């Protein structure tokens, strides 16, 4: 037998830094509202200088849980925080916000969430327990400048953090997270690690944040984005998202609940589907961001969208595998939606993007890779290396003749613009594009060119190999200057 002696001082520290919610009146039967008791435990813990609030095994029906600085909310294995239904009136009301014209209610309000914190330091949510959104709404009916309806007055996020510093979320699972399973806005020093999220709308949104790491996580979102860096106007100012690392993650678009139960039922491809996307909200922009060692399954592809006047600079994407991809495998665009005050918007900047070591199998025939600016404003300094894509194919001659519309001020979603006239790569309004060791294959014959480039200055293609139908052009160049093709099988009849 091994005996452990704990000093009186250590015993005092242990007894005063751990707070079990059961000791504050939490029942954990899934019927009684327990958030009042949990909030009492959090308040007492904070009054003692901080520590760990323990939620032991049980089902805890809750409205809004309010985090405080220096608190670790620990969900033990078997513990479930269950979101109350709207008619129970258990969620905090949304806070006042000076201007709702430039973002929807989901990005405007934080207090009407299942777990929320604002202006906090040193907070964490950890443990092997689960957050089950239950009664959270996933609707988004707020209109620009009119945030009534939809999620207002109900709970709409599982975890919402605003202007917090030194944040850790680790090991927990989230099911049915509402409009956002996790939304962090204006936060610094964020770690999200080993999370499992199975929800209907957005999984993880990192908005106007700095120094964030998302790692070793599985995020399933059949009807919205899985991991979505943004830089909205939710702080009533422009703020860039920068120094971001997303690594060792699996994103997917299976039906909600089928990631957790193991059945992995494919969801019908829709508006957006289980992807990693930068944007659409992009007032501040994105700088010094890395996505590495990630897997996309039954989802849309990677999207980099800069459309609200900010800057996108120094982005590296590497070591990515995609299978059963809808709509497109890679989408890089500069647009002019300019959702924000007129004195803060204008044409944005997209430059210095490196994408390498990408493998895509069974990509949709709607569109290949798209890299587009707008007339007079160019996407600049883009490198694609070691990219291998198997497309479904099946495009016809009419598709190949189609005049592809400019994005202009429209919402940047490729399927809204229709079938692309190139099956592999469409480039327009770009300066300095390098393609090295690129392979495009089609599972069925495709009568569209593999590559179309328009209004490009500085284009280098080296070791580019593509499938092409007999007698059809493999590439089309219009208004392309400083073109260099070598070691490639590209033909033009």
What are these regions (language model features)?
Residues 2, 7-493:
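Extracellular/periplasmic carbohydrate-active domains that bind, remodel
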